[in-house]
Amino acid sequence: MERLPLSPAVLFLTITLPILYFWILHTSPARHHGKQLPLPPGPPRLPKIGNLHQVPRQIPWKKYKEWSDTYGPIMSVQLANTIAVVFSSWDLIKTHVERRNTIYSSRPSVPFFLHATGGLNASILPYGPEWKLQRAIRSSVLKPSMTIKYRDVQSMETTQLLHELLSTNDFSVCLRRCIASVFLTVAYGERCADHAGLEAIDRLEELNRAIALHAEALFSGAAGILAQLVLPQALVDRLPVRWKKDADILHNRLTADLVARTRAALARPGWNWVKAFAIKEGTGSGEGDGEQGREVGLKRLAYMVGSLYEASMAASQALRVIILAGILYPDATRRMHDELDAVVGKDRLPDFNDAAQLPYTQAFIKEAMRWRSLTPMGSPRATSDEDECRGYHIPRGATVLVNVWAINHDEGVFLDPFTFKPERWIENPDLPQLLYGMGQRACPGRHMGQDSLFLGTARLFWAFDMALPDGAEAIDQERFLDSGTTLAAFLPDFEVRFTPRSEKHREVIENSVVVSSDVSSVTVAT
């Protein structure tokens, strides 16, 4: 009888299972509980694999909330050879995690991400000198005194956004172009002036999406459990696993794209982030750049700027959430319209000078981000040292998750948490805002992001009435509110009809629009 060839998956398991068996016999989750303190409580675990079989890939925050209701606001789960500690209490975050920032500011080691980005993406760097250096350099262009200088760019792009929505309801594409163009202008000195320019953006997003999807698939599959959570990195590097080849391919493509953008930005006239980072690093154009810059090189510079792209594009997803809230809660939208009409009137577009006089508009944004978080489990962290919290031992190297969804729906923090109430933020300005993270790992671009959300929201709701198109399927709130994974929870697609609120509003938009491919007129100078 002819012998059937082994599939790659079978071959992989044939090679790795004996190694795995030997490995798990000689390893177990961290058992050294300093001073004999126990780990935080959690659901019962199976030998070796722990709770891997119980953690759902989709909407895991609800399962963690269910567990925290049973085991308390600090709990733990075992993911094979990894301990994950989950915080579900704002009080614990405020009084413990934020006060011990240096312990809780590292990142879990995920081999696929490290391979796919060459270990150069600052968002996944462990806490240490390299991360601190990159954080300082990025903060130099993202601090409030600098982000104010980007407001002319944001104003121009949101004006074009309004003009585009006069002739199309394809708002998701328009939002992507708007936010992408803001980033490209300040980062590389190159606008995305029309939808044709999105082709280059699509390539970059495709690569980033592929990396994320591969990582998600690894976490949810058997091969991923072996490669990501059980086998040590030294052993992973020696195994003929397919994901490593995929990661190398994605890394090469992503690097080529980012380096090409960086070279072009260095050659353009005017100021941009690439040039600012190059000066800080001493990289420049490669002519007598200084010892540190020579070591860093163009590739590192390319990733330092390029890794900010995905974070910046979160603003387009956030605006989609705000638009959805505007459709589902018409009473709140009418109140925002009334405020905009009273402060701005019909003869001009809202601008940043109106911000202080638009408290309800600002509150609407905050409530939308609480109501439907983009990152319900936050960004995973790791402990750089062991710690003690409420009599429990937290091991060094533990993965740390913050259940943002649970905190945002905690009745002890937000009264009537399942009701959409923007006024809660006016009545209590000190309510926690978790959109941009917290502590030293908070998003460095949060000030720029807040500006984009304010101006985008104020102008969209000043300009348009928004509703579902005639005959469109009603929005299933459960489907839209309960979708996503541990890493991201973007909204499913939905349709919106944009109608100018009056002919006067249409006239102001048409007369205000500025569409120019001449970047020199909007490039930011220091």
UniProtKB/Swiss-Prot annotation:
Pathway: Mycotoxin biosynthesis. Signal peptide: none annotated. The chain crosses the membrane at residues 4-24. It is a single-pass membrane protein. Its cofactor is heme. It catalyses: tryprostatin A + reduced [NADPH--hemoprotein reductase] + O2 = fumitremorgin C + oxidized [NADPH--hemoprotein reductase] + 2 H2O + H(+). It is an enzyme of class 1 (oxidoreductase). Heme binds at residue 443. GO terms for cellular component: membrane. GO terms for biological process: alkaloid metabolic process; small molecule biosynthetic process. Its EC number is 1.14.19.71. Keywords: Alkaloid metabolism, Heme, Iron, Membrane, Metal-binding, Monooxygenase, Oxidoreductase, Transmembrane, Transmembrane helix, Virulence. GO terms for molecular function: heme binding; iron ion binding; monooxygenase activity; oxidoreductase activity, acting on paired donors, with incorporation or reduction of molecular oxygen. It is found in: Membrane. Belongs to the cytochrome P450 family. Cytochrome P450 monooxygenase; part of the gene cluster that mediates the biosynthesis of fumitremorgins, indole alkaloids that carry not only intriguing chemical structures, but also interesting biological and pharmacological activities. The biosynthesis of fumitremorgin-type alkaloids begins by condensation of the two amino acids L-tryptophan and L-proline to brevianamide F, catalyzed by the non-ribosomal peptide synthetase ftmPS/ftmA. This is Fumitremorgin C synthase. The gene is ftmP450-2.
